Amino acid sequence: MLYFIFCQNLSSSSSMSNSILFLSLFLFLPFVVDSLYFNFTSFRQGDPGDIFYHGDATPDEDGTVNFNNAEQTSQVGWITYSKKVPIWSHKTGKASDFSTSFSFKIDARNLSADGHGICFFLAPMGAQLPAYSVGGFLNLFTRKNNYSSSFPLVHVEFDTFNNPGWDPNDVGSHVGINNNSLVSSNYTSWNASSHSQDICHAKISYDSVTKNLSVTWAYELTATSDPKESSSLSYIIDLAKVLPSDVMFGFIAAAGTNTEEHRLLSWELSSSLDSDKADSRIGLVIGISASGFVFLTFMVITTVVVWSRKQRKKKERDIENMISINKDLEREAGPRKFSYKDLVSATNRFSSHRKLGEGGFGAVYEGNLKEINTMVAVKKLSGDSRQGKNEFLNEVKIISKLRHRNLVQLIGWCNEKNEFLLIYELVPNGSLNSHLFGKRPNLLSWDIRYKIGLGLASALLYLHEEWDQCVLHRDIKASNIMLDSEFNVKLGDFGLARLMNHELGSHTTGLAGTFGYMAPEYVMKGSASKESDIYSFGIVLLEIVTGRKSLERTQEDNSDTESDDEKSLVEKVWELYGKQELITSCVDDKLGEDFDKKEAECLLVLGLWCAHPDKNSRPSIKQGIQVMNFESPLPDLPLKRPVAMYYISTTTSSSSPSVNSNGVSVTFSGIEYGR
């Protein structure tokens, strides 16, 4: 839950590394200063006392800090980090660089008259805030001090209410940077009401060289559509002249006569003081003895020699790995090995005119393999691809064993010159994504759409239930669903797929997939299951019927109120389900009246059932097929979309967070194999 780091980790895997590190520490020890890092991903009762809660602020059951009760007025709450944070050095007089990232949410319940907002502040350690100076004073100021603080103070405010006495008169709600005053030193317009209840991710950074204090922010769902509204702000200020060397960091939020709820979801901070580099090194050179210089030279030469040997061994291992991969693949039945030369010829040297699409893993090209007289799609993985050697080998091993009419057929592979290529059958009608959201002239008729839904369900039934092992696809989305000449489904891209025994419930894999299609429990815990694949299947069904993307971050009509386009597709469809407006408001407008209402209702309700926030409430793929064939009735879903709660278990670490080989792998777009 909390990561807290001081620069004291001096361990190494070899004696030589230890020697070099010890020498470096010896040389630069006089100039080492405090360095601090922490990361709160949630806030809970009973946590170590690293956060102090004041006023009405309390840690809530959902892991957030609730600064005030939304049902009461004139409340103020604040939190502070319990330890002092050094922001400039008494020895050098120089300020530190620091960066803090946090996420928060404001529920502006009274859109016509908001509360007063939330702010991040820096103040002297132990400074006593005025007792309950609520409302626009944010518990930081009092009227008797002429809108100034009784102690040095710098704060960044997300102000939801315009106070005529001190707030700018040319904008309403705003983001401001304030220097010891309620009057913002610099500010920019910010429409608080249009972002109500959306999660905001903000970052505040200070550059000690340029003296620039900058703020950036972005929202998860609602985009900034007002041209007068910015998403960044900066102000030049020398913190070493304004604040003491040690300060406390914190957040404060207030509501006046209007109710407004403020929540802090996460908080991360890193701070380090720079050394006095130029003068230090001059003194250092003078102070080093001749023997120390010789020793350092020897260590550098030795390090270069060892590094060269390691590079040579790495190259030898790469060659051995390539040979090993080839042997593994050659043992697999079905797909055959092609030479790189043949693929270069088939794709006209991977000509841009042959390119069918490009994604995070690389590019896909149309090719003509004269050797087998077949048109193919050649998937060429890029050198810095997220889909590296392991995923390449994984995709070949899994898909080479699968045989089903609704799966893309893998014809062959190539692993030469450190290049990884997969050769698939060319699917002439491209991806479902290109038909629903692209610029193809021909509209998908309703019969074809329903056929696509059944075909995808058939492919998923084979993967989950009918093959020897359960195959978790983990990346079911419209751009991975190919359509042949008769618009039969061909599910492809098995680079993220995983095998597991049928009796197992889930498989912890690390996060991978595409936002908008990933189940909430999978995003939160990284645990893939049949149910997480079913969730993705449900999203695709909703896209098929509505002709809308799973996530659309646009806003219509420039209105101050939240529009439908600011919601995810699941939220919108479920809301219309509750209003009993599925058929009248959800079906793709391009279809007009040319669709089967019973089938449309079937796919929409089934899509919501599959995309239920609670994984235990989703159907199996067998149940889904029975519903699509009208062998089972439609489920009776809640009129309002349920909210599932997930507890994230975190541990304390003594080093900076890192991502291992099973880390995050997410994409925002796919590729289409075909035209």
Curated annotation (Swiss-Prot):
The name of this protein is L-type lectin-domain containing receptor kinase IX.2
Q: Could you tell me the gene encoding this protein?
A: LECRK92
Q: Where is this region: Legume-lectin like?
A: 36-269
Q: Where in the cell is it found?
A: Cell membrane
Give start-end of the signal peptide: 1-35
Q: How does it assemble?
A: Interacts with ABCG40.
Use in biotechnology or industry: Confers enhanced resistance to late blight mediated by the pathogenic oomycetes Phytophthora infestans and Phytophthora capsici when transfected into Nicotiana benthamiana. This resistance is associated with a high induction of protease inhibitor genes.
Q: Catalyses which reaction?
A: L-seryl-[protein] + ATP = O-phospho-L-seryl-[protein] + ADP + H(+); L-threonyl-[protein] + ATP = O-phospho-L-threonyl-[protein] + ADP + H(+)
Q: Which EC numbers characterise this protein's activity in its record?
A: 2.7.11.1
What InterPro entries does the record point to? ConA-like_dom_sf, Kinase-like_dom_sf, L-type_Lectin-RKs, Legume_lectin_dom, Prot_kinase_dom, Protein_kinase_ATP_BS, Ser/Thr_kinase_AS
Q: Which SUPFAM superfamilies match?
A: Concanavalin A-like lectins/glucanases, Protein kinase-like (PK-like)
List, for all copies, the residue spans of the domain called Protein kinase: 350-631
UniProt organism field: Arabidopsis thaliana (Mouse-ear cress)
The record's section on Pfam families has: Lectin_legB, Pkinase
Glycosylated position list: 9, 39, 110, 146, 179, 186, 191, 212
Family per UniProt? In the C-terminal section; belongs to the protein kinase superfamily. Ser/Thr protein kinase family. In the N-terminal section; belongs to the leguminous lectin family.
Described by its record, this protein's role is as follows: Promotes hydrogen peroxide H(2)O(2) production and cell death. Involved in resistance response to the pathogenic oomycetes Phytophthora infestans and Phytophthora capsici.
Q: Which GO terms describe its biological process?
A: defense response to oomycetes; pathogen-associated molecular pattern receptor signaling pathway; plant-type hypersensitive response; positive regulation of defense response to bacterium; protein phosphorylation; systemic acquired resistance, salicylic acid mediated signaling pathway
Predominant cellular place of this UniProt entry's protein: membrane
GO CC annotation, single:
plasma membrane
Q: Which positions, given as ranges, span the membrane?
A: 282-302
Segments on the Extracellular face: 36-281
Q: Name one GO molecular function term.
A: kinase activity
